[in-house]
Amino acid sequence: NLLIVLTSSLVVLIFPKIMGVTEYSYWQLYIFYLTYIGFFHLGWIDGIYLKYGGLEYTNLDRKQFYSQMILFSSFLMLISLVLFTLNLITVRDENARYIYNMAIISMIVTNLRTLYVYILQMTNRLKDSSVILISDRVLYVLLLFMFIVFGWHEYKVMIWADILGRTFSLMLSFWICKDIVFQSLSKFILDFKESLDNIRVGINLMLSNIASSMIIGIVRMGIQWNWNIETFGKVSLTLSISNLLMTFINAIGLVIFPLIKRTKTENLPKIYSNLRNALMLVMFAILLFYYPLKFILDIWLPAYKDALVFMALIFPMSVYEGKMALVINTYLKAMRMEKDILKINALVMLTSMVVTLVTTLLLNNL
């Protein structure tokens, strides 16, 4: 997980330096769309994660999970066909069409890979799930540096590096979960009831995750629509720097979830207090790094200096978002209170939407 944060740091800090602002901004637009590709599984994967979290891998019903894999893969292909068609018909801008198409390809690969990662994480095979995720980012960074050596700095090259990394990690997940993936078709069960139940269980968590990402996403959409692609890219860089810490915190939350699921109810309050106190101490200590980091980035990335001033507002948000992601959300998911998560995130998302409309349409002020 730390390695994933380090590779993300390299991309965030080095590539804005060597790419033009416009090229980097298109790359950030692609990354922005990737934030919402999880919407298209409709909570199917989240339902599996919630229903079977805490079980041992050896106790999983291989035939049932194999059947769900086939049905889920078919569903993704159908969704992607519809999206490709809509993109071809409705989008006229060449760059936007290319980015949409690549995001659709990434949607198929990433959602299918997430199914296997969740299976490993919910059964506490954390080392294997980490290997899958690390392999993606390591290959991605290696390809990017190879492209730098050859002088290829276009955003399209970066997108291909990202998709190749994700595809490699998907192939690796096939191998790690081969006892589920590689079975005879005769074992396939057309069990729509199980699929719909997984969606029913997981859709609240999926919607809450989407609503959570839309809190900042709506702001970014407002910037994209009201200003130019360069402004969008500069603000996105600032958000990416602040989100590096959240990447690590979310990874820790995935580790804690199966442990909490197996913990006795009477022990949960004490564990909650200890986690909360430890996290707050660390998060507030990290805020001390704001001023030296801002000073270094102003020198390193002068083209983005006018956007880096927003770090003063965004950086402290990581404290509260970290507490929500690591402590509160993890506990609510373990206690099957996904509807409460959805209500909270939906309310904040609506607030973000209203404020964004006011600041973009009425005030026209970043």
Predicted regions and their residues:
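Helix-loop junctions and terminal segments of transmembrane helices
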Residues: H41-Y57, S242-E266, L275-A278, I328-A334
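Signature of the first transmembrane helix
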Residues: N1-G43, I203-I229, L357
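Alpha-helical transmembrane segments of multi-pass membrane transport and lipid-handling proteins
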Residues: D46, Y66-D93, M171, I249, ...
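Membrane-interface junctions at transmembrane-helix termini in multi-pass inner-membrane proteins
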Residues: G53, V109-I132, P316-A346
